[in-house]
Structures are given as structure tokens and as C-alpha cells.
């Protein structure tokens, strides 16, 4: 059970514009991050307004999850519940999961198939495109009560979000005049995005969900921080998945600096070959570690890509993982400044052999809330949140590779984090 029953039950404390005049970014704006971006309720409310409800494409589903007419998935844009549904004409609608009558959340199931959506409170009903189609006792009873004569159903449907898809991935936005997803992501990010999502039909293998008691932005920072990868993760280093000597890169989109790809090429050896000087820098390296089942480390070269590992951050709520042959997406759902939910979807391809499916599932133990890698990230992020909440210090230092902002060819870099916060400050007005 999550600490807060439903991690997503948090409501906005104040719908008015929060007063942010008290907040001042450090003078060296690129190389320091103030603690209050992780802990302030006022900052969080503006993030919801300007980022999640602003001019961004938010991941909401994979088309493979809703293949048939009426199939739906309950999802989120920021903290806001939405319904992703396949309509009768084959298109995808994304609707705010809030009855137009009294605001009740009308869809509570995670997935299902419906011909319509009916609010449990007063039974108002909507079609799959969110149009209001039925109101009990609309004209009253015995010539008394009911809606006024000028009430128009077409004026009271569910809020419809802008929708786009790219090779089976569904994005939605509260912004009604969004640029194309291709423009939004940029060629640098699309290159590796399209390696995983090439248009091949996906096969969903399963889901994880976990709550992390930390600020949602920390998870984005973590995957724009290749510096930590070879220091925190013993598994990555010992078994050669990402080592300081491997060919690697941290790639940021050149337009906004908010999307990124952390990439590395695994060497052929199952176990890392690391010189003694490098070992001294990495306390996470432990000589003699091995696996009882070496099949876990096998890498099947299935893509036309130089990388064996790519971790993509797509602002503001999506991570696309390709860790050797385990594939998945992670959706970030914020729940105030000090908590977020991570929703994981693990998949393969419809044309995978049974052997390949078994291999993906076996290797899938790398990821997830208690995976060989996922567990350590969650704990480290929690430690940072505890530190910024309790300490009297007020800034974080991001000076590694200080000459770059955005893309870097070094793993010992925080350039992508700096690029993210440069854009963040512009959007947030900080």
C-alpha cells in the first residue's frame, strides 16, 4: 500500500497564482540549483500550470495497450487523471477524467473496454470522444425541475486534450496549438527513439508501479547524470554495461535542451576489463563478482545502433529504456514537491521468438522498483530529497564538465542537467 493510499489523491492547495517573489535563483545560474525547486508547494503548482498543463507533449500510453474500439487506459498528464481510449473510427482520444457536471473522476479502472463512460455520481454519460450524450431527468419530472431549455449537451462534454502519436506511442497536451511531435523531440532524440519504436507491433509483457518520496525532477536529473552511473551501480560496472572506458555519450536536443539520451556501447566481454587506475576511482567495482546464470548478460544485437544501452528522457514525463535487450517506458506522475509515482511498462515485439521473449523477461530483472539497477536509483534520489528538506544549505552544485551545456561526449559531466534547468527557468519565469 502506498504511503498516501493513492499517490495521486493530492489536491491543489490554492488555485490562485502562487506568490514566487520570495524565490531567487543563485547568481551563477548555470552551476547551482536552489533547494526550493525540490520542496516548495508554490513552485510545484506553477510547474503543473506551466509545464504539465503547458506547451509540452506528455506520454500517456502505448497504442498496443488499446488495440480495439472501446479499449481504454486510465493515465495521467502531470497529476491530472486522463482517459486514453480507442474510438469507433480507430483514432485515439485523450479526455480529462473529470465529469463536466460536478467534477467526479468518472473512470476508476486501470484498463477496460467501454462503449461509453458513465459518471457514478449522477449517471451523466459520454461517448468515446468525450461528447455528453445523456443526462437522467434532463427535462425534470412531472414538469418540474430539470435543466433549462437552453442547456446544450455539446457545450458540456469532457475536456479534450490534443493528441499525437509516433510509431505506436501516444502523447497528449492541454495546449491546443502544439507543434508536431517530430519538431518537439528534434532529430537528435528521434534517432534513438525510432530505434526502439520503429513501427513494429509491440507485445506488452507487464507493469510495475512504485512511489518515490522525492521530487519528480530528480528522476530526470538522474538520467541526465552519467557521472553517477559508474559510481552508484556496481552491477553496471562489474558486468561492463556502462564503464568509464566504454564508448558513451550524453546527448541533448539542440532546440530546448530538455530531452536527452544517455548512451553507452557494451564491450564484447561479459565481465568488465578495467585498468587499476580506473578501479581506484570507482568504489562500486568489486573484483570477483559473478552471476550464477551468465545468460543474463547476453546481448543480442537486434538494432542498427552503435549503442547497447540508451536511456532517453523526454520532457516532462517519459523515460524510454533500452538496456541491452530489455525494453520499456517509464511514466512520471508527480504528487506534490516531495513525491512522485513511477509507472513502468515492459514490452517486446510481436515477432519475437519464444526464446527472445524469455531472454527479455530474464534480463528485465535489471529494471523495475527492485531491479539490479532501479532499486539503487530510487534510494539515492530519496537520500537527496531528505537532504534538501532537512539541511540549512540551500544549493546544489552542477559544475562537472562546466564548459558544456547540453550534449557531452564525457560520462563525467552534468552538462545535460544544466541545459534542462536553463529551459526550466525560462518557462517558470524564475
Predicted segment positions?
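N-terminal pre-ligand scaffold of iron-sulfur
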Residues: 1-109, 159-165
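C-terminal catalytic domain of Rieske-type non-heme iron oxygenases
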Residues: 3, 86, 91, 97, ...
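Short, charged helix-to-loop "capping" segments that act as catalytic/coupling loops
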Residues: 48-57, 129, 138-148, 391-394, ...
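Short Pro/Gly-enriched beta-strand edge/turn motifs at strand-loop
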Residues: 54-66, 142-147, 311-316
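Rieske [2Fe-2S] iron-sulfur-binding domain
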Residues: 65-176, 183-187
Amino acid at each position: 500500500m502506498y504511503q498516501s493510499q493513492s499517490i495521486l489523491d493530492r489536491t491543489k492547495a490554492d488555485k490562485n497564482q502562487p506568490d514566487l517573489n520570495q524565490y531567487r535563483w543563485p547568481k551563477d545560474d548555470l552551476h547551482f540549483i536552489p533547494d526550493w525547486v525540490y520542496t516548495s508547494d508554490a513552485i510545484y503548482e506553477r510547474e503543473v500550470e506551466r509545464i504539465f498543463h503547458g506547451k509540452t507533449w506528455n506520454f500517456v500510453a502505448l497504442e498496443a495497450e488499446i488495440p480495439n474500439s472501446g479499449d481504454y487506459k486510465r493515465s495521467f498528464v502531470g497529476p491530472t487523471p486522463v482517459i486514453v481510449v480507442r474510438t469507433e473510427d480507430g483514432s485515439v482520444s485523450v479526455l480529462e477524467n473529470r465529469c463536466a457536471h460536478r467534477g467526479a473522476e468518472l473512470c476508476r479502472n486501470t484498463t477496460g473496454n467501454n462503449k461509453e463512460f458513465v459518471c457514478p455520481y449522477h449517471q451523466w454519460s459520454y461517448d468515446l470522444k468525450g461528447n455528453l450524450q445523456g443526462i437522467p431527468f434532463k427535462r425534470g419530472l412531472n414538469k418540474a425541475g430539470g435543466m433549462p431549455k437552453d442547456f446544450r449537451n455539446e457545450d458540456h462534454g469532457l475536456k479534450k486534450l490534443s493528441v499525437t502519436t509516433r510509431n505506436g506511442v501516444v502523447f497528449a497536451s492541454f495546449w491546443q496549438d502544439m507543434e508536431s511531435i517530430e519538431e518537439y523531440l528534434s532529430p537528435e532524440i528521434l534517432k534513438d527513439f525510432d530505434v526502439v519504436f520503429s513501427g513494429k507491433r509491440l507485445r506488452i509483457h507487464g507493469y510495475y508501479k512504485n512511489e518515490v518520496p522525492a521530487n519528480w525532477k530528480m528522476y530526470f536529473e538522474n538520467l541526465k547524470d552519467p557521472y553517477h552511473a559508474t559510481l552508484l551501480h556496481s552491477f553496471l560496472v562489474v558486468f561492463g554495461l556502462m564503464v568509464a572506458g566504454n564508448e558513451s555519450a550524453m546527448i541533448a536536443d539542440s532546440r530546448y535542451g530538455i530531452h536527452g539520451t544517455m548512451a553507452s556501447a557494451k564491450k564484447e566481454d561479459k565481465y568488465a576489463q578495467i585498468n587499476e587506475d580506473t578501479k581506484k576511482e570507482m568504489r562500486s567495482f568489486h573484483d570477483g563478482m559473478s552471476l550464477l546464470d551468465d545468460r543474463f548478460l547476453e546481448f543480442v544485437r537486434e538494432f542498427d545502433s552503435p549503442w547497447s544501452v540508451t536511456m532517453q528522457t523526454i520532457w516532462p514525463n517519459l523515460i524510454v529504456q533500452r538496456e541491452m535487450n530489455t525494453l520499456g517506458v517509464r511514466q512520471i506522475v508527480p504528487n506534490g514537491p516531495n513525491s512522485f509515482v513511477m509507472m513502468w511498462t515492459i514490452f517486446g515485439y510481436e515477432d519475437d521468438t519464444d526464446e527472445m521473449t524469455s531472454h527479455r523477461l530474464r534480463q528485465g530483472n535489471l529494471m523495475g522498483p527492485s531491479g539490479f539497477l532501479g532499486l539503487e536509483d530510487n534510494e539515492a534520489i530519496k537520500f537527496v530529497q531528505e537532504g534538501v528538506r532537512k539541511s540549512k544549505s540551500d544549493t546544489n552544485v552542477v559544475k562537472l564538465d562546466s564548459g558544456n551545456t547540453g550534449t557531452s561526449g564525457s560520462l563525467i559531466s552534468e552538462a545535460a542537467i544544466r541545459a534542462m534547468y536553463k529551459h526550466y527557468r525560462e518557462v517558470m519565469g524564475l
